[in-house]
Curated annotation (Swiss-Prot):
Modified how: Autophosphorylated.
Disulfide bond residue pairs: 278-290, 284-298, 359-381, 363-369
Organism field: Arabidopsis thaliana
Classification via InterPro entries: Bulb-type_lectin_dom, Bulb-type_lectin_dom_sf, Kinase-like_dom_sf, Pan_app, Prot_kinase_dom, Protein_kinase_ATP_BS, S_locus_glycoprot_dom, Ser/Thr_kinase_AS
Protein name per Swiss-Prot or TrEMBL: G-type lectin S-receptor-like serine/threonine-protein kinase SD2-2
Residue intervals of the Protein kinase domain: 461-742
Topological domains annotated Extracellular: 24-401
Listed Pfam families: B_lectin, Pkinase, S_locus_glycop
Nucleus found in the keyword field: no
Gene it is expressed from: SD22
Amino acid sequence: MPCTTYLPLLLLLFLLPPPSVQSKVIIKGNQTILSFKAIFRLGFFSTTNGSSNWYLGISYASMPTPTHVWVANRIRPVSDPDSSTLELTSTGYLIVSNLRDGVVWQTDNKQPGTDFRFSETGNLILINDDGSPVWQSFDNPTDTWLPGMNVTGLTAMTSWRSLFDPSPGFYSLRLSPSFNEFQLVYKGTTPYWSTGNWTGEAFVGVPEMTIPYIYRFHFVNPYTPTASFWYIVPPLDSVSEPRLTRFMVGANGQLKQYTWDPQTQSWNMFWLQPEDPCRVYNLCGQLGFCSSELLKPCACIRGFRPRNDAAWRSDDYSDGCRRENGDSGEKSDTFEAVGDLRYDGDVKMSRLQVSKSSCAKTCLGNSSCVGFYHKEKSNLCKILLESPNNLKNSKGNISKSIIILCSVVGSISVLGFTLLVPLILLKRSRKRKKTRKQDEDGFAVLNLKVFSFKELQSATNGFSDKVGHGGFGAVFKGTLPGSSTFVAVKRLERPGSGESEFRAEVCTIGNIQHVNLVRLRGFCSENLHRLLVYDYMPQGSLSSYLSRTSPKLLSWETRFRIALGTAKGIAYLHEGCRDCIIHCDIKPENILLDSDYNAKVSDFGLAKLLGRDFSRVLATMRGTWGYVAPEWISGLPITTKADVYSFGMTLLELIGGRRNVIVNSDTLGEKETEPEKWFFPPWAAREIIQGNVDSVVDSRLNGEYNTEEVTRMATVAIWCIQDNEEIRPAMGTVVKMLEGVVEVTVPPPPKLIQALVSGDSYRGVSGTSCSEGHGCSDLNTGLSSPGSRSSFGRPSP
C-alpha cells in the first residue's frame, strides 16, 4: 500500500521539466577576473580617458600599459560601464549588456553552456556539464594570435579600425587551406602578402620559423579543408617560464610579432611582414602618397590635405587626401606631372588616341576626370575617372606616369613627392651652406669626407649598380669623383636619428680603424638622405661562398684565415675601442673579403647609428634568424655575448660550406638530404661533440684540410652557441682559442638546439592538437655530452 501511495509522486517528478539553470553575473562594472597564474585579466575597458565607449576584453594583467588581446563587443560598445555586465544566461549563453544599451554581444554556441573557465593562456571558455567547451574566445579572435590558439580556415584575425578603435578594421590574417598558406587580406577579398606554401618544415616565405628556440609550430591535416595551425613558445630552460609573445594584425595592415621584455617592462617587436608598409593594400587611401622613407608612411602632396584630419592624426590614413580647394572641373584648374608612380587596384579610365594637349583639354572639360597619363610615341591618352589609391614610387617595369588635375587657387599645386621635397627644403639649404664648410674641416681630421647627395648620386651612376642589400639599406658600387677608386655606398633606410646625432655617431665609427674592419671613407647627411661611403671589397661577402651549388670554393686555409680575421675584428669592437660596440648583426653577409680574401667586418655601429632598439635591430635580420642569440627573445640584456653567439653560428657555416637553415633540400648535396640537415647547427653540434668532426666539413674540400684546425674551430663554434651567455667565451678569448693559445675541451651540448635533435619536431607536420586542459609536448633533451675530454686542453673561460 505505501508503494502504491508514492508511485504517482515519483512518476510526477520524472514528468516535470528539469530545473532551469539560473542566470549568473560574472562581471559587473569595474570588476575583473584574473586567469590562472594571473597572466591575463578579463574586464571592461576604455581605450581613452573620458571616452563613452566601453568594451569587455582580455588583456595582460601585470603590464603598466594595457595590452588588449581580445574584445567581445568590438562592434557595439557600451556607454554605461557601471551597469554593464558579463552574464551567463539561463539559456546557456554568455552576454554583455547594460540597462541603457540592452544586449550588445552574445556567444553563438550551438549547445548551452553551464559554466565558464578563464585559462592561463588567455582563453575564455564556455563549458557544458561534462566540462567540454561549447564556445571559446580562441575560436573567435579579434586582432591577436596567442600561443596555443588553433587557427583554421574558418578563423580570421581582423585588425582594429585604428589605434583607439577596436571595431573591425580593413585587414585580416587568414589560413588558406587550398593554398596551404597564411594570407593578409584587405576587406576580406584582396590578398597582399602571404607566407608561401607549407613545405612540411616551414612556410616558403618565412624560413625563420624553423629556428627551434623561437616557436614550436604544428600544422594539423595540411593540404585538406580541415587544416589547422597553432604554435607554442617553449621555455628557454627547465626553470624559466615561457616568454610572453603575441602576433597581432595592426591597424596599418602589417602582421607583427611582439615579445615582452621584463627588464624594460615593454613590448619589443620581434618580426613583421610586410616589412615595407607601402606593400599594404590601400594603406594611404585615395590620392594618398606612401613612402617607407618618411617618419610616417603616408603623406598628402602639396595642394592636398587629409579628408579626415582626426583619423590622420591617429595614424588612420584610409580616407586618403582631397584637394585643398574643392573638386576638379574649375576654370582655374591646371595640371602638374606626378612622375612614374603606381597605385593599388584598378581605376576607371577612358582611352583616346589624341595629342597630349588634347588629352589635357579633354580631362579639364570632364568633371569626373582626376588626371591622365599620355604616351608620346603612340599618342595614347588615358583619362582617369576615379582617384587612384595608395600612390607610391614605381619600381621595376610597372610604371603609370600620371598627370593629376590640381587647383592653383591660393598656391602652386604640385602633385609629386619628388617635386615636393626640394620645395620644402629650399629654406634649409641656404642655412646649411655655411655649416657644411665647417663640417668638412672637422671631419677632415678623421679622414672622412662629407659628400653631397648629388655627388654620390653621380658617383653611383644614379644608384644603378646594386651590389647588395642588408637590413640597414642597399649597397651600390661607385667611383669617387676625379678618381678611379671604387667605393661601396650604403644608402640607409628609415634613418632613426636626427642630423646632429647621426654625425656624432659617424664621427665615432670613422675613428675606428682595424685591419679586419671595413674602413669608412665618408658620408652624406643631407635633408632626409643618410649615406655611408666605404672601401669597396672586390671579393664580395662571405655569404656568396656558402652554397653547395656555387662555383666559388674557398680552401681550408682561406676559411681559417677568414674565421680568425673576423674574430679579431669583432674582438676589437668589443675590447679595443674606447666605447664597447656591440655589432648586433654578425652574419656572413656582413663579413666582406678584400682582393686577398682577408676578412673585413662591415655594418659595425649601425644599430646605434640608426637608433635601433630591439624591434628595429631584429627587423633588419629578416632571413638571418639562425644567428640571433636566445637572449634577444628572452628579454635579457643584450651584451657582447650576443655577437659571440652569432659568430659561432657563422663558424658552423664556414666549416660546412653551407647555410644553417635550408628549407629547400634541393640545395643540399645528394648525401645530405637527411631530414635533420635542414637546420644544420643541431646536427653539426651532435657530430662535433661526439668526435665526428670530419662529417661536418664541406665535402667539396675532398679531405684537404688541417684536421687539428678543423677540430679546434668546430669546438670553438659550439662553445660560442651555448644557451647561457655566461659560459660563452669573450671574443678576445675566442681569438686565442682559434690561435691555439688557449686550449679547448668538448663543450656541453646547447640545450635549445639539442631539443630538435632529440626528435621533438619543430618543423614537421604534427598529428596532435593543443587543446585546453591538455598541455603541448615539452622540450626533450636526448643528447648527452661524451664523458671523455678533448685531447687539446682545458675548458675555455
